């Protein structure tokens, strides 16, 4: 997927065309489009959705979502949509985004205090194929296999923030039950890991963390340099564990946690893609744990 493959698709359509006008279709356009779509290539594969995520919103006020959408083949853009769901609902609601030039907007209905709204943006081309998902792959079904969407916390106030830079917190890396031989959790400055270090493409471990102007995060072991192979210090041999501090939430109503994470399990040059999994769990007594995320 990307600009090169999309250009190849367009060249094939031009070769099939009989009136030098792709906007009105070609004799075999449906078969061509469907064949390329089987490989994840659409007319909008190189579209760019510029969007500033909404993370906090006041209660009982509509939540306005806006994005700037640009595409090389803008004539192929049929619609832009915002999908959202509330709390534990697994069904997505669809909002058609209104266009004003390259700017698109949608309004998520007002929500009461304590609700958490998940949402993502996607594009549909003239042939009905979805593309340009933002965040990428957040539309995958079942939800456990999907990337995280954007989340809006309605009516919440920030109580504690731990970013490993300005407030580290009492995090614990590792547990006696861990059996991983490489890729153990560390806290520090990450070194990027790439399928192709010469072009910095195919990123497996980011070379940066999320906090603006920060440098540190928790990660599963650095390689010696970005020139090492992606398997140099990946997680091998078993699991590794990272524990947050304990938080006393006795005096709080409907508390919520947020976190930023990067996880990949299918690099194109990986030795065994798709064989590992990611799990996040939470407990209120230190004994009984519930899954927050589980890709197994």
Language model feature labels by segment:
Residues 249-253, 262-274:
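Extended, low-complexity, turn-rich repeat/linker tracts enriched in Gly/Pro/Ser/Thr and Asp/Glu
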Residues 77, 270-279:
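Short coil-to-beta strand junction motifs in C2/discoidin
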Residues 286-296:
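Terminal beta-strand-rich extracellular "head" domains
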Residues 157-231, 273-275, 294-296:
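Extracellular glycan-recognition surfaces and repeat-rich motifs
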């Amino acid at each position: 997927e990307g600009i090169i493959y999309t250009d190849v698709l367009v060249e094939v359509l031009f070769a099939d065309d009989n009136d030098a006008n792709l906007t009105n279709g070609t004799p075999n356009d449906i078969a061509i489009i469907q064949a390329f779509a089987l490989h994840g290539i659409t007319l909008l594969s190189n579209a760019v959705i510029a969007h500033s995520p909404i993370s906090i919103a006041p209660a009982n006020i509509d939540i306005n979502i806006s994005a700037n959408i640009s595409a090389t083949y803008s004539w192929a853009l049929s619609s832009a949509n915002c999908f959202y769901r509330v709390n534990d609902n697994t069904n997505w609601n669809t909002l058609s985004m209104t266009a004003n030039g390259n700017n698109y907007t949608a309004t998520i209905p007002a929500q009461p205090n304590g609700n958490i709204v998940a949402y993502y943006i996607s594009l549909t081309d003239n042939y009905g194929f979805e593309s340009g998902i933002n965040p990428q792959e957040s539309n995958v079904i079942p939800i456990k296999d999907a990337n995280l969407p954007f989340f809006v916390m309605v009516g919440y106030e920030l109580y504690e923030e731990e970013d490993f830079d300005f407030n580290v917190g009492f995090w614990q890396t590792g547990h006696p039950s861990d059996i991983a031989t490489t890729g153990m959790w560390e806290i520090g400055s990450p070194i990027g890991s790439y399928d192709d270090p010469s072009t910095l493409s195919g990123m497996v471990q980011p070379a940066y963390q999320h906090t603006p102007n920060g440098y540190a995060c928790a990660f599963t072991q650095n390689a010696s340099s970005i020139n090492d192979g992606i398997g140099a210090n990946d997680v091998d041999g078993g699991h590794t564990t990272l524990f947050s501090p304990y938080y006393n939430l006795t005096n709080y109503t409907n508390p919520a946690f947020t976190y930023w994470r990067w996880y990949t399990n299918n690099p194109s040059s990986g030795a065994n893609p798709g064989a590992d999994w990611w799990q996040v769990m939470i407990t209120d007594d230190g004994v009984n744990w519930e899954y927050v995320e589980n890709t197994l």
